[in-house]
């Protein structure tokens, strides 16, 4: 986990290993961050990643297969609390 400042905005980066498959992690990400969850707009989904925007910030998630689970990388601006909640769910 770490923070980096780019272009005047502070972004946080998080990583986690999950026992869920990459497809299931992305499905849960859309449920959690999308219109039926936190309410962010789904900007992109596919190819092992998804991005969400809204409220002056964003969430980007990239998922790679790792053994029987997934290696999950998240980047966010303004949605740190929600990203931490999501990481606890996967």
Task: For every predicted segment, state its role.
Residues 15, 51-53:
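Mature extracytoplasmic or otherwise solvent-exposed domains
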Residues 44-49, 68:
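Ser/Thr- and Asn-enriched, surface-exposed coil loops between beta-strands
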Residues 12, 38, 46-48, 57-59:
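Residue-level marker for the onset of beta-strands and adjacent loop->beta junctions
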Residues 53-90:
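Beta-strand/loop substructures that line and gate deep hydrophobic ligand-binding cavities in soluble
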Residues 38-43, 52, 62-63:
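Short, exposed beta-strand/loop patches in secreted or surface proteins that constitute
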Residues 2-42:
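Terminal, regulation- and interaction-focused segments at domain boundaries
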């Amino acid at each position: 986990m770490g923070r980096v400042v780019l272009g005047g905005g502070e972004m946080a980066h998080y990583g986690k290993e999950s026992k869920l498959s990459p497809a299931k992690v992305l499905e849960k990400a859309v449920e959690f961050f999308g219109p039926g969850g936190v309410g962010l707009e789904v900007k992109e989904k596919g190819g092992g990643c998804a991005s969400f925007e809204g409220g002056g910030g964003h969430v980007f998630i990239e998922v790679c297969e790792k053994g029987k689970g997934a290696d999950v990388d998240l980047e966010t601006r303004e949605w740190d609390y929600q990203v931490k909640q999501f990481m606890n769910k996967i």
